[in-house]
Amino acid sequence: MKIYFATGNPNKIKEANIILKDLKDVEIEQIKISYPEIQGTLEEVAEFGAKWVYNILKKPVIVEDSGFFVEALNGFPGTYSKFVQETIGNEGILKLLEGKDNRNAYFKTVIGYCDENGVRLFKGIVKGRVSEEIRSKGYGFAYDSIFIPEEEERTFAEMTTEEKSQISHRKKAFEEFKKFLLDRI
């Protein structure tokens, strides 16, 4: 079974393939197709995107939307994570948190899967905190260099993709997706 992953981000494909590697009958293939990103919750964006891409391809497709939510900033950047990363970046988030004791944050991923039977959503959350500074060993992307997951001292960007894939929000969402696929194959 081939499932197309509509994303321009090769890191997401790599992470998905690591998580789903033991499903021998499932092949995830990247398709670089852009779809309109509506303003809404992660769930609304994933559902809309999956339907939109499926209506073009007429083949099983997944889209994924993630957000980075910082408690002390009332959930900002949240659903605007990509835009905020491209504008103020990690430096801007750290600046907004200056003088704040509460550094709790979480990543949330929603995968939208669409086939001839409609859309299904799969969610994953990983809680943690925002580091005091940017910390990276060259791994990861976006907010990974400022996010320390619970029960860790390293940021996601200080972990290899394989290490991050064991605990990430994307892994949790893909594990839910994997359970769904196992029931179908």
UniProtKB/Swiss-Prot annotation:
The entry's description of pH dependence is: Optimum pH is 10.5 with dITP as substrate. The reaction rates under neutral conditions are <30% of maximum.
- Identify which residues the record assigns to the active site: D65
Q: What is a single molecular function from GO for this protein?
A: nucleotide binding
Task: State the reactions this protein catalyses.
Answer: XTP + H2O = XMP + diphosphate + H(+); dITP + H2O = dIMP + diphosphate + H(+); ITP + H2O = IMP + diphosphate + H(+)
Q: What are its GO biological-process terms?
A: nucleoside triphosphate catabolic process; nucleotide metabolic process; purine nucleoside triphosphate catabolic process
Identify the GO cellular component terms for this protein. Answer: cytoplasm
Task: Report the InterPro entries cross-referenced here.
Answer: dITP/XTP_pyrophosphatase, ITPase-like_fam, RdgB/HAM1
The positions annotated for binding Mg(2+) are E37, D65
User: Which HAMAP family does this UniProt record tie to the protein?
Assistant: Non_canon_purine_NTPase
What the protein does comes down to: Pyrophosphatase that catalyzes the hydrolysis of nucleoside triphosphates to their monophosphate derivatives, with a high preference for the non-canonical purine nucleotides xanthosine triphosphate (XTP), deoxyinosine triphosphate (dITP) and ITP. Probably functions as a house-cleaning enzyme that removes non-canonical purine nucleotides from the nucleotide pool, thus preventing their incorporation into DNA/RNA and avoiding chromosomal lesions.
By sequence similarity, the record places it as follows: Belongs to the HAM1 NTPase family.
Quote the protein name from its UniProt record: dITP/XTP pyrophosphatase
Organism for this UniProt entry: Methanocaldococcus jannaschii (strain ATCC 43067 / DSM 2661 / JAL-1 / JCM 10045 / NBRC 100440)
